[in-house]
From Swiss-Prot:
It is found in: Cell inner membrane. One of its GO terms (molecular function) is proton-transporting ATP synthase activity, rotational mechanism. The gene is atpF. One of its GO terms (cellular component) is plasma membrane. It comes from Shewanella loihica (strain ATCC BAA-1088 / PV-4). It is a single-pass membrane protein. This is ATP synthase subunit b. Its main location: membrane.
Amino acid sequence: MNINVTLIGQTVAFIIFVWFCMKFVWPPLMNAIEERQKRIADGLADADRAVKDLELAQAKATDQLKEAKATANEIIEQANKRKAQIVDEAKAEADAERAKIIAQGKAEIEAERNRVKEDLRKQVAALAIAGAEKILERSIDEAAHSDIVNKLVAEI
């Protein structure tokens, strides 16, 4: 192969071109590539962080939901206990009131019965006195006496 001036000139021009590219073109390209790599790496890191934050938020939301359900169940349980307590208290009050009313009614019935007995005793006594007066006013004969006693028995 022949080495001539043209080949040497082309080689020198190529070396100058490579040097020029290495000096002025290559560093900005490398900076742009490195910046892009950094942005991509930052974007991926942000995406990973966002995924972790999302998972953490979902876990926290799940925990809060479980806690809220537990609190709601506790409140419902307390309400049911309170309801049962109120119902029991109302039943006890109703039973006490019923017993009181029954006792009052029995006392009133007993008092009325005693009053009626007393009235009957007074009436029987009055009738007996009236019968005795009638018997004493009339002459004592067997037929009149029997008739008065029968009338008294019918009135009683």
